[in-house]
């Protein structure tokens, strides 16, 4: 066997090994997330389901030069620019369309990375999580402070507390994962709140505010106990 054939065979084996390693990569990915151990099988199953459904499209997009970080940035810009701009102009339908685009694109970066054999990187997981959390904060602060008291806006105090407790919950959930501190799950209220905000606009019926108030209490307590577990581990 020639040297070039040997090198080609070795490269092929390495490529197959990389493709055969999703579980290990997924574990690395999950460390940079706010999912507990009981949630991870569901999270991974949903990620694989999205990949299986959209695999032909994802591969085609990858061949056109689209990369996961491009999708993440586009998702972030939709919620950073589109949502506050339309909400401030009282174009609530367009604001929710921008939010829907943010959510849809946010669900595509992971499967696209998997289609390109780039899944499981800590950098990609960090960008994805930052997009999730920052998007939530932008949405909540926008609906709290823009057009306050009008339309489908929410109480300023409750909205602010909700955004702050969500941030602290995320910080200590991720810290526990990075320190290998086991916790079962974290109740995530982001998507239910988005849906309730949409319902408030469509039907003028406000369930978003009381749900956010209750969720803030839960997230504050979860963040506090997460802080205690992290502090004990760092002694």
Each predicted region: which residue ranges?
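Membrane interfacial helix-start motif at the N-side
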Residues: 55-68
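A feature for the membrane-embedded catalytic helix bundles of lipid/isoprenoid biosynthetic enzymes
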Residues: 2-58, 129-235
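Acidic active-site catalytic centers that drive phospho-/nucleotidyl reactions
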Residues: 106-109, 128, 132
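A short, mixed-charge helix-start or loop-turn motif at secondary-structure junctions
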Residues: 39-43, 64, 120
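Residues at alpha-helix termini
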Residues: 64, 116, 178-181
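Membrane-embedded alpha-helical segments that form the functional core of polytopic membrane enzymes
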Residues: 68-123, 207-216
């Amino acid at each position: 066997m020639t040297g070039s054939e040997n090198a080609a065979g070795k490269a092929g084996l390495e490529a197959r090994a990389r493709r055969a390693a999703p579980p290990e990569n997924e574990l690395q990915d999950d460390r940079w997330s706010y999912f507990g151990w009981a949630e991870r099988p569901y999270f991974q199953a949903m990620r694989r389901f999205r990949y299986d459904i959209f695999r032909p499209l994802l591969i085609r997009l990858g061949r056109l030069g689209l990369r996961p970080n491009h999708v993440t940035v586009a998702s972030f810009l939709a919620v950073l620019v589109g949502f506050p701009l339309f909400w401030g102009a009282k174009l609530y339908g367009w604001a929710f369309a921008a939010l829907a685009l943010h959510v849809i694109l946010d669900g595509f970066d992971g499967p696209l990375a998997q289609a390109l054999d780039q899944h499981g990187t800590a950098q990609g997981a960090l960008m994805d999580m930052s997009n999730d959390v920052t998007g939530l904060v932008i949405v909540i602060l926008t609906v709290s402070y823009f057009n306050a008291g009008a339309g489908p806006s929410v109480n300023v105090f409750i909205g602010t507390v909700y955004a702050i407790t969500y941030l602290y919950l995320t910080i200590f959930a991720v810290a526990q994962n990075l320190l290998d501190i086991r916790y079962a799950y974290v109740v995530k209220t982001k998507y239910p709140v988005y849906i309730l905000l949409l319902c408030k606009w469509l039907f003028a019926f406000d369930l978003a505010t009381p749900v956010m108030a209750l969720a803030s209490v839960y997230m504050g307590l979860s963040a506090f106990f997460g802080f205690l577990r992290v502090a004990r581990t760092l002694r």
